[in-house]
Amino acid sequence: LYLNEEENGWMELEKPPKRGDGMESRAARHLLRKLRWATVGAPFDWTKRVYEEERAPEVDERIKRACVKTLEIVFGKEAAFVEKGEDKFFDGQVGLANFYAPGDTLNGHVDDAEMNLSKPIASLSLGLPAIFLLGQKSKALKPVTALIVRSGDAIVLSGESRTMFHGVPRVFSDGETLMSSSKTFRFPEALESAFDDDDDEFLLNFAKRTRINLSLRDVR
């Protein structure tokens, strides 16, 4: 199936669209606008709330390196994040990517599907800014801490915060004034310069109207 934008509906193709043709592009662009999450490494079964480790591809080293660097800043290099052995502090085995458009929210929840909750989660933000709420171990408890996270910001959930409720009640749009100051949010020039190919225009426009949150963690 692909979206027929002129007729505002779906049409069935006799065969799948080929890479690079117009129908593939229109189908991909429509689906990209609907994208809300993806897995990095082992797929996550949202129904059973388990990671399918037997089908786990390797996490991209660039993603793992960025998260390890974040943890080194927080805990210090002596924590030995990438040393070989069963007791290493962080391996970055799997990740979840969440995609938010302005108006999207993420309800309060706890990341507790991993077997070892003593290991941290490193969370990286790209694109649009958002409000991040960190609560307590119960939704009924206070206080709740509110932070504005911008593109390039990182959050580490470790220790007590690893099992605390957290969520995203608000995503700002490009050009919107942030509540904490009179400054207007603009898409980072450094991030925009990464889209330097002619074919990247659609991806750049997608990034400008999306918040991407990538959280890396260990299953075991």
Language model segments and positions:
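Non-heme Fe(II) oxygenase metal-center motifs and adjacent flexible, charged/small-residue loops
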Residues: L1-R220
